[in-house]
Design a protein with these regions (language model features):
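Glycine-centered, phosphate/nucleic-acid-interacting loop/turn motifs that mediate DNA/RNA or nucleotide
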Residues: 51
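Short, locally clustered residues in the helix-turn-helix/winged-helix DNA-binding domain
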Residues: 13-19, 98
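Pre-recognition alpha-helix immediately N-terminal to the DNA-recognition helix
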Residues: 9-14, 92
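Short acidic, hydrophobic short linear motifs in intrinsically disordered regions
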Residues: 21-29
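Amphipathic alpha-helical dimerization/coiled-coil segments
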Residues: 76-120
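Short beta-strand "wing" residues that participate in macromolecule-binding interfaces
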Residues: 55
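Short, hydrophobic-biased segments on the C-terminal half of alpha helices
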Residues: 41-45
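Short, cationic-aromatic polyanion-contact patches
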Residues: 4-7, 58-77
């Protein structure tokens, strides 16, 4: 899966949240100042080339839809971060979060409970 720029991720969120869209709908959904139609159209075509979107024809216009789900994208991005910055160790990720106080003791307990429940269901 290819990486997305921040703007491409922002555009994908519109598709993940709303389903299939025409570019003109995408323009309307953006807050002021609204981007130009051609600008969004260029981003949408780039997302299609990267394999994140596809389209169906409606006369002379296209309606675009997501090929990659938000959860799949998040999971893949997380795997890439863990591999690149934490030597592919999720333990290192959790340890770093605890050291930076971004993860509380209570949250660690909840994680351990979830892991325990998951192990119980697998048995």
């Amino acid at each position: 899966m290819k990486d997305l720029t921040a703007k491409e991720e922002e555009i994908m969120r519109y598709f993940w949240d709303n389903g299939p869209l025409f570019v003109r709908q995408l323009v309307q959904m953006h807050p002021e100042p609204k981007p130009h139609f051609n600008t969004l159209s260029t981003y949408v075509r780039a997302l299609e080339e990267k394999g994140f979107l596809s389209h169906e024809s409606f006369g002379t216009t296209y309606r675009y839809f997501s090929l990659v789900g938000e959860t799949d994208y998040k999971n893949q991005t997380l795997r890439q971060v863990v591999k690149k910055y934490f030597d592919n160790s999720y333990l290192s990720v959790v340890s770093s979060l605890i050291k930076e106080e971004a993860l509380s003791v209570e949250e660690v307990r909840k994680l351990l409970d979830e892991v325990g429940e998951s192990d119980t269901k697998k048995s």
